[in-house]
A protein has these predicted regions:
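Flexible mid-to-C-terminal extensions adjoining Fe-S/redox cofactors in radical SAM and related proteins
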Residues: 1-3, 7, 266-335
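Hydrophobic residues within beta-strands of alpha/beta enzymes
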Residues: 26, 58, 109, 176-179
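Short, well-ordered alpha-helical microsegments
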Residues: 68, 94-96, 158-161, 268
Length: 335
């Protein structure tokens, strides 16, 4: 149930900052007036190269990826490379026409829901956000595309988690992913101080465990936190182990995952907004394959050292649960 870093090797793509909403917790400052986006050719080439480097999953986010016209082309390229595909969306644009166009291209839809309807609308900065999303769910079920919900956990909405889980089950979702708020982008301005604290994380684990037992496999519950014990037992899983020269021939996916492609073409480790000091590079400067080779030569060790520092910080603390990606990302930005 605790799964901040799985065994899958994930390429997360943010192709556009264009969005139909201006959510309070948006990490990328996306909105209706944004037009920055990456070309189909650039992303399809990157996906093919990433597959050769061992990445097995392409996850499309945004912005709102349903507003990215070449979405299907990128997803189909991923399928051609043998990769699994997912799309994270606010769910408001999942009409029958769009879903028909995307049929066969998406392996999993991840739809955002941030609490009871009024709380969801407030977070989404739109009084019709929940109703519009909910009205699209019959089309999602009709499409046959497997789907789940993503719930952003803050200091203020844990009590709404049981309602969200019951809503997810009743709508036919397979998964409920609970993701702690990261105070980056617009969230740093609009939700400053709202990230879950130590007590909130502990309460979230208890609630998630109870929900998991209650639904008994009918709804998978995933909490995006890592326990201190997990880090101590398996540092390699978090790229926090001692690296040696034998790693020079390893594919990039064995050195960093998730890998993030941001809307400006930057390729960074682990999480949107990660320090560019550790960036794999920019897709506008060189092909993905070239960037990967250069990163292995020039930055692999420094990234490994950073992960080891994050590992030490967490395992030497008395706190049981941690947001691994956020911890390492914050360390990357303060050096």
């Amino acid at each position: 149930m605790l799964a901040p870093t799985g065994r899958s090797r994930i390429l997360q793509i943010h192709p556009t900052r264009r969005c139909n909403l201006r959510c309070l917790h948006c990490y990328s400052l996306s909105g209706p007036n944004q037009r920055e986006e990456l070309s189909e050719e650039l992303l399809c080439s990157a996906v093919e190269d990433a597959s050769a480097e061992g990445y097995t999953v392409v996850s499309m986010s945004g912005g709102e990826p349903l507003l990215y016209d070449p979405l299907r082309a990128v997803l189909d390229k991923a399928h051609q490379c043998g990769m699994v595909t997912s799309v994270a969306t606010n769910g408001m644009l999942l009409d029958e026409k769009r879903l028909n166009r995307l049929q066969g291209s998406i392996d999993l839809l991840a739809i955002s829901v941030d609490g009871i309807p009024t709380a969801h609308d407030k977070m989404r900065n739109n009084p019709a956000a929940f109703k519009t999303m909910a009205n699209c769910l019959p089309y999602v079920r009709q499409s046959g595309i497997p789907f789940g919900f993503i719930f952003t956990l803050t200091q203020h909405n844990l009590r709404e988690l049981p309602w969200v889980a019951e809503f997810a089950l009743n709508q036919g979702a397979q998964l409920l992913q609970i993701h702690p708020l990261d105070e980056v982008g617009r969230a740093s301005e609009c939700l400053n101080g709202s990230s879950p604290d130590t007590d909130d994380n502990a309460s979230a684990l208890l609630a998630a465990t109870q929900l998991d037992a209650h639904y008994k496999g009918r709804l998978k519950i995933q909490l995006d936190l890592v326990s201190r014990n997990m880090l101590m037992e398996d540092p390699k899983r978090y790229f926090a182990h001692q690296q040696n020269d034998s790693w020079e021939d390893e594919p990039l996916s064995e050195l960093v995952s998730p890998l993030i492609i941001e809307q400006d073409g930057a390729v960074v480790p682990l999480q949107y907004g990660f320090s560019r000091d550790y960036a794999i590079g920019s897709l506008y400067d060189a092909p993905f394959s070239t960037l990967a080779a250069e990163w292995k030569d020039n930055k692999r060790r420094s990234f490994g050292d950073l992960c080891q520092r994050g590992h030490k910080e967490i395992t030497s603390s008395n706190t049981r649960l941690h947001n691994w990606y956020s911890t390492v990302s914050q360390l990357s930005c303060v050096e």
